[in-house]
Swiss-Prot record:
Motif extent (Bipartite nuclear localization signal): 564-578
Location of Omega-N-methylarginine modifications: R444, R496, R518, R526, R536, R539
Name of the molecule in the record: Heterogeneous nuclear ribonucleoprotein Q
Domain notes: The domain containing eight Arg-Gly-Gly repeats (RGG/RXR-box) may be involved in RNA-binding and protein-protein interactions. It is methylated by PRMT1, and essential for nuclear localization.
Region of interest called Disordered, as start-end residue ranges on this chain: 497-623
Self-association and partners: Identified in the spliceosome C complex. Component of the coding region determinant (CRD)-mediated complex, composed of DHX9, HNRNPU, IGF2BP1, SYNCRIP and YBX1. Identified in a mRNP complex, at least composed of DHX9, DDX3X, ELAVL1, HNRNPU, IGF2BP1, ILF3, PABPC1, PCBP2, PTBP2, STAU1, STAU2, SYNCRIP and YBX1.
GO biological process: chromosomal 5-methylcytosine DNA demethylation pathway; CRD-mediated mRNA stabilization; mRNA modification; mRNA processing; negative regulation of nuclear-transcribed mRNA catabolic process, deadenylation-dependent decay; negative regulation of nuclear-transcribed mRNA catabolic process, nonsense-mediated decay; positive regulation of cytoplasmic translation; RNA splicing
Residue numbers of N-acetylalanine PTMs: A2
Residues where Phosphotyrosine is found: Y373
UniProt-annotated stretches for the region 3 X 4 AA repeats of Y-Y-G-Y: 460-488
Comp. bias intervals (Low complexity): 504-522
Gene: Syncrip
Length: 623
């Protein structure tokens, strides 16, 4: 029974039963940092509970907390306190992630409530005790392993080809179900489950890196379209981490060594520069290069830095984009290839010379030379093998040629290329652009009055697949690095532009026309006859049948030069770099692609430090 105190006046006063608040030694430090009294008390309460030490939170986290009003800060700290921090390595970054999630919910007008039910911690703990792996949790992902225990694997970090992408994962599924499944295929290096901070559930996809390529391939065979739960089938395919950047606007006089030195000054982790020279002048490059970095993380950081506009190389802010990653075809498929890719050909080399040089090793089906490279089709693989062994590195018309087996076509890549090309047509449909010095012959097209060529090398479409897919070993001259870049410098591509007015009554059919580049021999100079900037051809007259034409810059329109129009019924895709909607499951994804855009605000300085380094690049059907 509670006792009562009687004062000198004889009146009774209730006893103060509230216990004294215990503060940590860092409480005053929090007040001195500018936190409101109640916020400082709440954070200090977390300190006293032993969930977090003051040394675990850096200045950025405290400063970010000060930006909230008192109610918001208290709600954030309560959510932080209620979170399971047992597997969180960087608690300061985790707190910033909680703050970011809170703001996102506020913007969406949704109630800031507790996250949905997460993983069963008892099962997760049992898994970790059984395997000996570690688990690192951030607001954007859950990373299991990396590296694994020495008892499992003690070798070097796995190389390209050991990672798989797992899509269409049920949102409430976690490591306790994924790990036992995939470890049957082989030893796991790490498993990264992408998380949605707003819901506390996974995003529907994960990346699993195995210790060997064989294990990764086995996982694809075993679990692609595997029913992981009743009615729920996951999709699995080999994933390729991208560590290569495309950089344009490179001075043509620069060498590989100069480019490597210059970009190493402004970025870290640069390991190689892939540079190509002009076919007619080996002393000059083609105005672009590819930068290869140690891994995807360093490449992503370099890309953000180079795209910031603050970094200039040789006084220029260059064009920077992702290059397509290297993808290795199935060894079983490559073992059947009978086509050789020959590069570094001299200008004097003709198809007849190539046929004479290679026919001695076996019967040829076809020889096709395009620019400074060629494809040699053998009737039998043995002949191709002999030719590569004998001719690789040999001198042919003054140049040492390089030979590899051409990589087979990839249908999904072909479909993505078609989408990118159609998008490119729309992007430049109304854009005046003066053509580069070289102009390819007209290529067959479609559309009223004939469509001008896409600007590909002659007869390219017959070799589209091999040409595109081959280049990954030699870093590709164009195909694998996205068509929009083929408008650079010396590239043989027709400029996109409108032609001049056609004469009334005899004009080509409606559609933006093709015109010769200015200043070319045999064509009208700019300002000469028929060179006025044109618009649509006048109506009237007989419509021309479908024919050939080349896209040009400003110039005369008329005669038998075909018109150009937008692709019928084609809607502008999301981006020029990677269209992902309406793709089938079999598309090979790029793992670890950085979050889009250069705006990293609201992340409290943690975006570039291994936080949420991955995104879903695959559309809703993957989730």
């Amino acid at each position: 029974m509670a006792t009562e105190h009687v004062n000198g006046n004889g009146t009774e006063e209730p006893m103060d039963t509230t216990s004294a608040v215990i503060h940590s030694e860092n409480f005053q430090t929090l007040l001195d940092a500018g936190l409101p009294q109640k916020v400082a008390e709440k954070l200090d309460e977390i300190y006293v509970a032993g969930l977090v030490a003051h040394s675990d939170l850096d200045e950025r986290a405290i400063e970010a907390l000060k930006e909230f009003n008192e109610d918001g800060a208290l709600a954030v700290l309560q959510q932080f306190k209620d979170s399971d921090l047992s597997h969180v390595q960087n608690k300061s970054a985790f707190l910033c992630g909680v703050m970011k999630t809170y703001r996102q919910r506020e913007k969406q007008g949704t109630k800031v409530a507790d996250s949905s039910k997460g993983p069963d911690e008892a099962k997760i703990k049992a898994l970790l005790e059984r395997t000996g792996y570690t688990l690192d949790v951030t607001t954007g992902q859950r990373k299991y392993g990396g590296p694994p225990p020495d008892s499992v694997y003690s070798g070097q970090q796995p190389s390209v080809g050991t990672e798989i992408f797992v899509g269409k994962i049920p949102r409430d599924l976690f490591e306790d179900e994924l790990v036992p499944l995939f470890e049957k295929a082989g030893p796991i290096w790490d498993l990264r489950l992408m998380m949605d901070p707003l819901t506390g559930l996974n995003r529907g996809y994960a990346f699993v890196t195995f210790c060997t390529k064989e294990a990764a391939q086995e996982a694809v065979k075993l679990y692609n379209n595997h029913e992981i739960r009743s009615g729920k089938h996951i999709g699995v395919c080999i994933s390729v981490a991208n560590n290569r950047l495309f950089v344009g606007s490179i001075p043509k006089s620069k060498t590989k060594e100069q480019i490597l030195e210059e970009f190493s000054k402004v970025t870290e982790g640069l390991t190689d520069v892939i540079l190509y020279h002009q076919p007619d002048d080996k002393k000059k490059n083609r105005g672009f290069c590819f930068l290869e970095y140690e891994d995807h993380k360093t490449a992503a950081q370099a890309r953000r830095r180079l795209m910031s506009g603050k970094v200039k190389v040789w006084g220029n802010v260059g064009t920077v984009e992702w290059a397509d990653p290297i993808e290795d075809p199935d060894p079983e498929v490559m073992a059947k290839v009978k086509v050789l890719f020959v590069r570094n050909l001299a200008n004097t080399v003709t198809e007849e010379i190539l046929e004479k040089s290679f026919s001695q090793f076996g019967k040829l089906e076809r020889v096709k030379k395009l620019k400074d490279y060629a494809f040699i089709h053998f009737d039998e693989r043995d002949g191709a093998v002999k030719a590569m062994e004998e001719m690789n590195g040999k001198d042919l018309e003054g140049e040492n040629i390089e030979i590899v087996f051409a990589k087979p076509p990839d249908q999904k890549r072909k479909e993505r290329k078609a989408q990118r090309q159609a998008a490119k047509n729309q992007m430049y449909d109304d854009y005046y652009y003066y053509g580069p010095p070289h102009m390819p012959p007209p290529t067959r097209g479609r559309g009223r009055g004939g469509r001008g060529g896409y600007g590909y090398p002659p007869d390219y479409y017959g070799y589209e697949d091999y040409y595109d897919y081959y280049g990954y070993d030699y870093h590709n001259y164009r195909g694998g690095y996205e068509d929009p870049y083929y408008g650079y410098e010396d590239f043989q591509v027709g400029a996109r532009g409108r032609g001049g007015r056609g004469a009334r009554g005899a004009a080509p059919s409606r559609g933006r026309g093709a015109a010769p580049p200015r200043g070319r021999a045999g064509y009208s100079q700019r300002g000469g006859p028929g060179s006025a900037r044109g618009v649509r051809g006048a109506r009237g007259g007989a419509q021309q049948q479908r024919g050939r034409g080349v896209r040009g810059a400003r110039g005369g329109r008329g005669g038998n030069v075909g018109g150009k129009r937008k692709a019928d019924g084609y809607n502008q895709p999301d981006t020029k770099r990677r269209q992902t909607n309406n793709q089938n499951w079999g598309s090979q994804p790029i793992a670890q692609q950085p979050l889009q855009g250069g705006d990293h605000s609201g992340n409290y300085g943690y975006k570039s430090e291994n936080q949420e380094f991955y995104q879903d690049t695959f559309g809703q059907q993957w989730k």
